[in-house]
Amino acid sequence: MHLDSLVAPLVEQASAILDAATALFLVGHRADSAVRKKGNDFATEVDLAIERQVVAALVAATGIEVHGEEFGGPAVDSRWVWVLDPIDGTINYAAGSPLAAILLGLLHDGVPVAGLTWMPFTDPRYTAVAGGPLIKNGVPQPPLADAELANVLVGVGTFSADSRGQFPGRYRLAVLEKLSRVSSRLRMHGSTGIDLVFVADGILGGAISFGGHVWDHAAGVALVRAAGGVVTDLAGQPWTPASRSALAGPPRVHAQILEILGSIGEPEDY
């Protein structure tokens, strides 16, 4: 039996579960109850409630355990595991921005084989199974068309110029400077999952993520690949749950951005 024949019914079940979670997502917009600090990040009561609801429903319906952003779960390299971000773009969500989403990926032995991204405030619901196509609101989409970096929008992760870590702020500024010399159409949406699904949908021509959280990436990686795009880390290695960054785009744009990144030097030099 082909993998897609196993996965497609799971995606159908998961879609109904995310539809059911949408009401709670909408009610909590502009939520201001930060319940836990995680560096500069936080969760709201709505994050926790959505994760509890979706996890319980997924396990009951599919028999597959869930690794969630807020409560964790089984290892992401398990035979089968759902990976959930109940609200991607939590700061946007709490501030009242519509750029927030529910992200759900299905991993098989650590490989994203399905992705679902729900954007309740603007209506799009995206799904895909490995091999494609991308499906938007129930309608199959054409494969991604390739393009030139100079002609497309590029999503870039948000940051502080004074931040440290694996990708210091000064390195990220260097990335922006180099990219802007080729494309003046850089965008910061404050949601990795939205950046990735926008690449899959052809809204963005590329996206750079300086983060390594699997729940931010699993769904979008599946969607981009299903649409015909490429997703690697910033060094050009295929994205895996252990990756600490991501670069997504159609093949030509991906290669052009990767060449620019290679010209900047190593992050630790900054």
Curated annotation (Swiss-Prot):
The keyword NADP does not apply. Belongs to the inositol monophosphatase superfamily. GO terms for molecular function: inositol monophosphate 1-phosphatase activity; metal ion binding. Substrate binds at E69, I87, D88, G89, T90, R187, D216. Pathway: Polyol metabolism; myo-inositol biosynthesis; myo-inositol from D-glucose 6-phosphate: step 2/2. Mg(2+) 2 binds at D85, D88, D216. Keywords: Hydrolase, Magnesium, Metal-binding. Catalyzes the dephosphorylation of inositol 1-phosphate (I-1-P) to yield free myo-inositol, a key metabolite in mycobacteria. InterPro entries: Inositol_monophosphatase-like (IPR000760), Inositol_monophosphatase_CS (IPR020550). It holds the Pfam family Inositol_P. GO terms for cellular component: plasma membrane. Its EC number is 3.1.3.25. Its cofactor is Mg(2+). SUPFAM superfamilies: Carbohydrate phosphatase. PROSITE patterns: IMP_2 (PS00630). Induction: When comparing gene expression levels of the four IMPase family genes in exponential cultures of M.tuberculosis, the level of cysQ is the highest, almost equal to sigA; impA and impC are expressed at approximately 40% of this level, while suhB is lowest, at 12% of the cysQ level. Disruption phenotype: Strains lacking this gene show no difference in colony morphology and no differences in levels of phosphatidylinosotol mannosides (PIMs), lipomannan (LM), lipoarabinomannan (LAM) or mycothiol (in the absence of exogenous inositol). This is Probable inositol 1-monophosphatase ImpA.
